[in-house]
Amino acid sequence: MNTSQLREKFKEVFGVEADHTFFSPGRINLIGEHTDYNGGNVLPVAITLGTYGAARKRDDKVLRFFSANFEEKGIIEVPLENLRFENEHNWTNYPKGVLHFLQEAGHTIDSGMDIYIYGNIPNGSGLSSSSSLELLIGVIVEKLYDLKLERLDLVKIGKQTENDFIGVNSGIMDQFAIGMGADQCAIYLDTNTLKYDLVPLDLKDNVVVIMNTNKRRELSDSKYNERRAECETAVSELQEKLDIQTLGELDLWTFDAYSYLIKDENRIKRARHAVLENQRTLQARKALEAGELEGFGRLMNASHVSLKYDYEVTGLELDTLAHTAWEQEGVLGARMTGAGFGGCAIALVNKDKVEDFKKAVGQRYEEVVGYAPSFYIAEVTGGSRVLD
């Protein structure tokens, strides 16, 4: 959607002109899964599937929201003084949360807004539609009210909204990738320190294909919080002998030497994934920087195997996509991405083989699962921003 279309749609809905238009990307994580809340490293990119917005300030204290993705909900009106979570306010709880925490941080938001939203991230796909919306609202408010905000502060407010307003116990990777994304770069982020480097993404004759299971995944209803709790318990057991706060602080040798302290086989498996995935992510960064895409692909494959057997977050749909992708000509690697239990997988595919790849994987998936997957080419873009 371009800016003139955004402005036209805004005027259709609200009857006035928008002040500005905005875009906030989605994200995929190339590798480093379920490590962000374990103090480990991640390697995400911001993508051109994302969330568009148009907005204007109002003279009163009323917030009016409209989403083209939920047209049946119509315009949802919220008093600026009432930024509490309410089920009937549906998707607008995300913007309400961002506004609430901006105000709590001392930023002055002294009038209402009209906000039009359109997103082309499939809902429940695991490509971070909620984080994209959170950062979009942050950028809108920053522009309309001329707030002087560090981008990292907006990232943290997005995470705070997810954790403390919506109630999903997620890490910071999604908001960080979306807020800090850069053209044609992956972000190598240490989630323990929030130190990061931009890693140029030269895929040569290859593209990243996103494979959507089309099995909707509700993060707050999934086993995500259970996995996080298992890892936190493993850390507390390891602390009997080790001075650590997160699994991300461990190398494989130390983990192997002290894993006997973890009293449950499942928790050992969860912790082993977190430690090994952290090492794989470091190796993947080095492979990208050296242009060793075959090695990068092998690390993707190993990541999926670990997520299947040690972390147990894949399932029939994601496994079918990844396993079938591995068998195709021109594929360097494939893995699930995101929290799992549905959502999406990604594959690194030679660009000349993409159509054959989609046909073969789609056919096999439909035979096994009973309905078709969807495919998108991941184009890497910059972070959340003002368009005009």
UniProtKB/Swiss-Prot annotation:
One of the protein's GO biological processes? galactose metabolic process
Look up the record and report any one GO term of the cellular component aspect. Answer: cytosol
Record-linked NCBIfam families: gal_kin, PRK05322.1
Q: Where in the cell is it found?
A: Cytoplasm
Q: What is this protein called?
A: Galactokinase
Taxonomically, the superkingdom here is: Bacteria
Protein family (similarity comment):
Belongs to the GHMP kinase family. GalK subfamily.
List GO molecular-function terms, semicolon-separated. ATP binding; galactokinase activity; magnesium ion binding
Alphabetic keyword roster = ATP-binding, Carbohydrate metabolism, Cytoplasm, Galactose metabolism, Kinase, Magnesium, Metal-binding, Nucleotide-binding, Transferase
Q: Which InterPro entries match?
A: Galactokinase, Galactokinase_bac, Galactokinase_CS, GalKase_N, GHMP_kinase_C_dom, GHMP_kinase_C_sf, GHMP_kinase_N_dom, GHMP_knse_ATP-bd_CS
Locate the residues binding ATP.
Answer: 67, 124-130
Gene that encodes the chain: galK
Q: In which pathway does it act?
A: Carbohydrate metabolism; galactose metabolism
Binding locations of substrate: 33-36, 224
EC numbers listed for it are 2.7.1.6
Annotated binding of Mg(2+), by residue: 130, 162
Return the annotated site residues (Transition state stabilizer): 27
Pfam families given in the database record: GalKase_gal_bdg (PF10509), GHMP_kinases_C (PF08544), GHMP_kinases_N (PF00288)
Q: Is the keyword tRNA-binding in the record?
A: no
Q: Which residues form the active site?
A: 174
According to its UniProt entry, this protein's organism is Streptococcus thermophilus (strain ATCC BAA-491 / LMD-9)
The reaction(s) annotated as catalysed by this protein in its Swiss-Prot or TrEMBL entry are:
alpha-D-galactose + ATP = alpha-D-galactose 1-phosphate + ADP + H(+)
